[in-house]
Amino acid sequence: MSASVASVISRFLEEYLSSTPQRLKLLDAYLLYILLTGALQFGYCLLVGTFPFNSFLSGFISCVGSFILAGNGSLRNRSNNVFTLVRCFSSLVTLFYSRSPPREVPRGACIALFCERGN
């Protein structure tokens, strides 16, 4: 059983590394970073407690929102649909008006720039 699981994982990694474009690998690395950050915050909440509850909520919800936005950008790039620059720009404008903290704007700008199709 473990040999088959190991072979599936090794085949997945080989195909992922050989066939996935660099742009999507970067988005996947960012998604992994956000996931680990959210898990770390949630683990800290379980172990230590939620004394400054508003701080925990803002950090955790920021991770969830960033994960959703980055996942959306990743799905846009993986699909066979053609997305125009106008649609990406409108997505960026919507993102700027929907996110109030200034530190969220560079993340959103990076995600919106990735949705332009091409090499």
UniProtKB/Swiss-Prot annotation:
It is a multi-pass membrane protein. The modification N-acetylserine is found at S2. Keywords: Acetylation, Endoplasmic reticulum, Membrane, Transmembrane, Transmembrane helix. The chain crosses the membrane at residues 31-51, 55-75, 82-98. It comes from the Eukaryota. GO terms for biological process: protein glycosylation; protein N-linked glycosylation. It is found in: Endoplasmic reticulum membrane. Residues 2-30, 76-81 are cytoplasmic. The keyword Transmembrane helix applies. Residues 52-54, 99-119 are lumenal. Pathway: Protein modification; protein glycosylation. One of its GO terms (cellular component) is oligosaccharyltransferase complex. The keyword Transport does not apply. It holds the Pfam family DAD. Subunit of the oligosaccharyl transferase (OST) complex that catalyzes the initial transfer of a defined glycan (Glc(3)Man(9)GlcNAc(2) in eukaryotes) from the lipid carrier dolichol-pyrophosphate to an asparagine residue within an Asn-X-Ser/Thr consensus motif in nascent polypeptide chains, the first step in protein N-glycosylation. N-glycosylation occurs cotranslationally and the complex associates with the Sec61 complex at the channel-forming translocon complex that mediates protein translocation across the endoplasmic reticulum (ER). All subunits are required for a maximal enzyme activity. Component of the oligosaccharyltransferase (OST) complex. OST exists in two different complex forms which contain common core subunits RPN1, RPN2, OST48, OST4, DAD1 and TMEM258, either STT3A or STT3B as catalytic subunits, and form-specific accessory subunits. STT3A complex assembly occurs through the formation of 3 subcomplexes. Subcomplex 1 contains RPN1 and TMEM258, subcomplex 2 contains the STT3A-specific subunits STT3A, DC2/OSTC, and KCP2 as well as the core subunit OST4, and subcomplex 3 contains RPN2, DAD1, and OST48. Belongs to the DAD/OST2 family. This is Dolichyl-diphosphooligosaccharide--protein glycosyltransferase subunit DAD1.
